[in-house]
Each structure stands twice: as structure tokens, then as C-alpha cells.
């Protein structure tokens, strides 16, 4: 009989692979941003909250750099404020936990609660895109939603084998959020404008010349009062 520990280790390894795939899933988005030199309506929220370990920290730092380079001033300011707030918050948490919690159990509880909160935000952040309002899934990548679902499902199973509430809650909610995203994608996929539709150009219509006739009085030089004035027709061609 296979031991629960072995199953848990296997699920954990698979979870690590899927997590790595989760961090790499936005690569097509940022390749598009680099090519177009514009972030358009893509959001930085998932990147700002997903930096949860060493490998992802490096990957997400690259994403943030690309997003920052091609953002407008408003987005750059927002990112700067959020990153500065995160840095100050993490410093405050570290100092507070080290000085205020004197046992390993209490420190684990405090940090675990924070991990639950930020893990939940990580999964729910793509929902900040106004899919329902715009009736478009253009800025909610399908790959990110699929990998989020697989990642949350795998880590939920991992946490349930040997119950860990701090892993179960955020990843269980992550599965629900990912399902919601996939449902939204299925609903609004057909109403999303295709890229080729956006690039359609109206046919060029050749300008049509218009002939306009103007009747103007022609005066007689010998008649100052114009009593003997005659009329002449002048044809004017107008090119638009």
C-alpha cells in the first residue's frame, strides 16, 4: 500500500512544476507588450501580488520591469506606490513578528494568516479586469486561468493529504476563482472582438468632382449705375 507521505511528496513535486508554469503563463502577454510597446488595458495586479518565493521573485521582477517600461505615467506612478507600500508593509511585518511574537507557533500563525490573504488575492486579481462590463475577455488570458486552476487544485490536494489550513484556504479559493474565470471566458469569448476585426480598414472612396454653376452679373463699363447689366454663367469645378 502506498503511504500518504509518498503521495504527498509526489503531489508536492507536481505542484511545484505547475506553480512554475503559473509564473511563466504570462510570458505571451509580455511578449505582446514588448512587440507593441504598449500595455493597453492589461493590469499589473497579478504581478504585484504573486511574488511569493525566490524563483517567482526573479520572474515577476522581469515582468514588472517590462510593464513599467511600456506603461504611461499614471500606471508607473501606481506601480511605484504599490511596490513602496508592499516593501514598507513587509518590513513592518518582519519587525513586528520578530519583536512581538516570541514563539515559533505564534510567528507561524501570523505569517500563515498573511499568506492566506495574499494567496487569495493572487488568484482573484485577474477578476479585477472588467470582463462583464466590456463583454470581452481580451485582457483575461485563458492560459493564466487554466494554469491557476491546475495549480490551486494540485496544492489543495497536497494540503488535504496532511491537513494544512494555510495551504488549503488560499488554494481552495483559488480553484473557485479559476472556475469563475473559465466560466466568464466561456460566456464572453464569442463577444470578444477578434484581432483581425480591429485591423479592418474601410475601403478608400475616390473623391468625386462636382461641377457648380454660378450666375454672376457682368456690368457694362459705360453704365456706372449698372442699369444695363447682363448676366454670365461661370462653371467652377470643386475637388474635395
From Swiss-Prot:
The keyword Membrane applies. It is a multi-pass membrane protein. GO terms for molecular function: sugar transmembrane transporter activity. It is found in: Cell membrane. Residues 34-46, 100-108, 162-164 are cytoplasmic. The keyword Signal does not apply. Keywords: Cell membrane, Glycoprotein, Membrane, Repeat, Sugar transport, Transmembrane, Transmembrane helix, Transport. Its main location: membrane. Glycans are attached at residues 225, 235. Gene3D superfamilies: 1.20.1280.290. It holds the Pfam family MtN3_slv. Residues 10-48, 110-191 form the MtN3/slv domain. One of its GO terms (cellular component) is plasma membrane. Mediates both low-affinity uptake and efflux of sugar across the plasma membrane. Forms homooligomers and/or heterooligomers. Belongs to the SWEET sugar transporter family. This is Bidirectional sugar transporter SWEET7c.
